[in-house]
Amino acid sequence: MFQPASMPRFCRLAIALFLSLVVLTACGGGGGGGTPPPVSSTLSFPMLSGYRALVANGASHNFTISGTCTGSGNHTVGAANIPTTFEGSYALSGASTWTMNLTACSVSSLASTATTYYDSNYQPRGFYSVGNNYGVYLTAPTIPATVMVGNTGTIGTEALYTNSSKTVGNGTNVLSYVVEPDTANTAIINLISRAYNAGGTLIATEQDRYRIDAAGNLTPVSADIQYSYTSTTHLVLTF
């Protein structure tokens, strides 16, 4: 059964790092030959500077939904330019909003808002989604300066709580990445978030894919969300 109260927990992965977005590659042009196979580029891609630019400028993208539920929606992330305090020290913040209109589902619409907090270099520090989760990185996340196809790594672990008092734990998100082939001049950065409940059981895996070029421009491709444990819900958001 689709559970709207849980949805922001996993979609917010996009909020917490990189903004969000199965590589169902953008429908290629007409003609009949289908989509060409991916190419392993030999270029180096500036992942860190591309990420910083994306966070600093904000973005808004529409998407379609397939899988257990179908529909469409929008994800808007405001530029992280609001000075504030997070966990007792200076931070920059930006708000992110998800809206979804659903069919063939137990709910017809969803909407959620979260605020993500960054240091002065746009390194993510945590987030707060009222009524859902308060997340804090256990240590500063590691985002590589440059990557190549085939690279993998762990970015960080985010502790989740029910609210900012941090008195009740609500699990963890473990974030990693894989750089996948795409074209001779681009690659796909696959951000993988594994969400665990407070008992340490895996409850969902989200894969957010972005296309990156040699200049560091990041373009959302899709988000693939697979629930587990008490649900078999599978959602694919294609941007």
Task: Give each language-model segment a name.
Residues 2-15:
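Bacterial N-terminal signal peptides that target proteins for export
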Residues 2-4, 19-46:
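Bacterial Sec-dependent N-terminal signal peptides
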Residues 32-89:
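N-terminal cleavable signal peptides for secretion/export
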Residues 70-77, 106-111, 168-174, 202-206, ...:
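Amphipathic hydrophobic-ligand
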Residues 77, 135-142, 173, 206-209, ...:
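Edge beta-strand at a domain terminus
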Residues 88-90, 97-110, 161-167, 196-203:
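Short, cysteine-centered beta-strand-loop-beta hairpins and adjacent loop/turn segments enriched
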Residues 104-127, 182, 202-219:
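A short, surface-exposed beta-strand/turn
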Residues 135-200:
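Short helix-loop boundary/capping segments
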